[in-house]
Every structure is written in structure tokens, then in C-alpha cells.
Amino acid sequence: MLWFKNLMVYRLSREVSLSADEMEKQLSAFSFTPCGSQDMAKTGWVSPMGSHSDALTHTVNGQIVICVRKEEKILPSPVIKQELQDKIERLEGEQHRKLKKTEKDSLKDEVLHSLLPRAFSRFNQTFLWIDTVNDLIMVDAASAKRAEDTLALLRKSLGSLPVVPLTLENPIELTLTEWVRSKTLPAGFALMDEAELKAILEDGGVIRCKKQDLFSDEIAVHIEAGKLVTKLALDWQERIQLVLSDDGSLKRLKFADTLRDQNEDIDREDFAQRFDADFILMTSELAALIKNLIEALGGEAQH
């Protein structure tokens, strides 16, 4: 079962019909196909249930999960460089002259084409969770670029996708800094022992703390000197641990064992039933966490 490790949260900026049946047809036109002999990379949709289903969408209680697979050919630059150099030296020796830059560029293309069929592939998968109840889309990605690339494929598949990053009324770093400065956190949240502080001025430095008492005088001095808390490790209701960043992303999600074990009574051999139970559990917990976080951070910006 997928347990999201990261969350990039996006708001649907206008009402849009996202029916799983319609999406299934739209995504199938962009389903994943492996790289051909001359492809550097391929991206497409696969079943979120892996080999247990052919369906490209899976829906439970208004929550839809979909999955993107990306295949990239790995061609280490030293290998390309050596192969190209060998070819240049051989041709220059045969023709008794130095090759022009345009000729070398052309040779590089030839080298790439000759190496591609023998290159190894690297695969990665990115899950998206569409919360049709709360009009949110969550991407399990650690970087904004990967999330945006994934949403770009969804937009291409659906024809349009009016989403914007979830934006809060108050700058997140100011709220996080005040929590640490005042040693007071909203109900349900507890401070852990990791943070990042940045100076307001770009050349003012960055401090990364691990295994640190964040309510200590040492941290207070940095805040008094004008540094802002830009990342903060939090515990939510002893159920989920996370690192909240000033861009609103949630990283290094860790679900408590007591939470993950709630569906242990379901036979693991019954993959579909266990998948549904875990998906319902995960999405309900994360939806509650997101709601609490939005409130704790001062509410969502009104567009």
C-alpha cells in the first residue's frame, strides 16, 4: 500500500467535474509505454494498484488516487565523453586533419544513438491524490518541479486543470518563527527537534538544527538577531510526524505504528480490501492534518 512520504498541496481554483470514469478514458490516452531503443525518457499513467489492477484510477469515498511512471535512460557523461573522444581521434587520424566543432557535435549525436539501446533504465513513480470532497490535489513529491511535471501530465490528459499551490493568508515562516519564539504551538501540534532558520537578507546565512532543543536560548538568540524559521519538524496528535516548509510543503511524513497497524486484521492476501482500507485511513488522517494545519497557520488566502 502507498503511504505518502511527502505532500505538495494544490487548490482547485474553480469548480471542475472530476469523475473517475471519465478520467479513466482520458488517462488511457497517455498511459505509460516503455522507452523505445532511441528514447531518452518516457512518462505515462500506470495503475496505482500496480500489477493487481489494470485501472488507471482508483476511487474510494470521493478520494481518487492515480500514478505516473517515468523511465529515464542512464548514460553517464564519462562514457559518452570517452566514446566520443575515441571516435574523434580515429577520424582525425584517418583524415589527417582536425574536425570542426559542427562535425564533433554531429558525432556526439551518433554516439548517443549508438549507446541508447544499451543504456540501463531508471524508473520512478509519483502518486497523486485528488480529494473531490475538499477540492484539493496532493502530490507525493519532495520537489515543486516534480509535482508540477506530474500536474502538467494530468492537465494534458484532462484538457485543463485549474489548480494553484495552496496559499495561506499569513507568510508561513512568520508563523513558524512565532511558534518557536513564544514556545507556544497550536492544539494538536508538538515541536520536535529539527528546524532550519534563515536570515532575512540573502547573504545572512542558514542554520540547520537536528537533535536540538528548539526552545533553547541558543535558538532564541538567532531569532532575536532576525533569522526566520523556514522549516520545522512537527508531531501531529502523536499520529503523524512531518517537516513543514515555508512553501507549504510537507516532507518526510511518518505515520505512527499504531495508525498503520489499524488494518492489520485484514488479510494481506486480500490486496484490494487492504488497499482500500489503508487508502481510506491515510486520506482521512491527512485530510484532517491539512485542515488543522491551515487553521493553525492563520487560514487560507482568499483569492
From Swiss-Prot:
UniProt GO BP: DNA recombination; regulation of DNA recombination
Which PANTHER family does this one have?
A: RECOMBINATION-ASSOCIATED PROTEIN RDGC
Q: Which GO terms describe its cellular component?
A: bacterial nucleoid; cytoplasm
Q: Which InterPro entries match?
A: RdgC
| Molecular function GO labels | double-stranded DNA binding
Function (record text): May be involved in recombination.
Q: Which UniProt keywords apply?
A: Cytoplasm, DNA recombination
> Family per UniProt?
Belongs to the RdgC family.
* Protein name in UniProt: Recombination-associated protein RdgC
Matching entries from HAMAP family are given as: RdgC
**Location(s) in or outside the cell:** Cytoplasm, Nucleoid
The record's listing under Pfam families reads: RdgC (PF04381)
